[in-house]
């Protein structure tokens, strides 16, 4: 499992291990308050959903700028390599960043990443100087192929986007973390509760990226704070070292010094 103490992505250090999406909020104000409560250093946003070119009077864009967070544009909704590469290139020009959350969707039903298109697009973008953070499944071979083409971060899903199902395949996620020890890995998508984020961090994952679980909560800022606390707690638990599970009970109270008649 990852022994990295600092949260470092492409050579850049971050204080928070929480990456928050900016879509689906009922209002820009709720989004701003949620970003603040999340204590995040990175926010994701999609070029297709916003038009930052029109910045005058754009409340959304102004709030994003005021947050001071690093921008992580995404290629959400892209279904082909060409489409994803083109959108990434446009995002670099508009948002003035070479960071990109790469998404190539292969199925409309569960929004599962297209593994073949994802690897191809990642290779193209990395050759163009992009810092690619690929949204992928928990498939070990896919993750290895992404590393082979130059990705320095992996973002496997916990469950399909927006489902709130949590960590559906714990075996795969644990195996992935154990097999790929020294690469930052962020659980991206599918989480619905802070407890699920804490569990992922306890497994040794380096960070959490989510959107819907906060944006669709009854109180998004409070939920953002809850996730931030859970992520911190999960990381502390991982660093502390969890006890091993046992099949039999073991008393936690010592018997030394008890009266002799106790055993009669």
UniProtKB/Swiss-Prot annotation:
Keywords: Cytoplasm, Schiff base, Thiamine biosynthesis, Transferase. The keyword Transferase applies. Residues 245-264 are annotated as: Disordered. GO terms for cellular component: cytoplasm. It comes from the Bacteria. The active site is at 101 (schiff-base intermediate with dxp). Belongs to the ThiG family. Catalyzes the rearrangement of 1-deoxy-D-xylulose 5-phosphate (DXP) to produce the thiazole phosphate moiety of thiamine. Sulfur is provided by the thiocarboxylate moiety of the carrier protein ThiS. In vitro, sulfur can be provided by H(2)S. This is Thiazole synthase. It comes from Cellvibrio japonicus (strain Ueda107). The lineage of its organism: Bacteria, Pseudomonadati, Pseudomonadota, Gammaproteobacteria, Cellvibrionales. The gene is thiG.
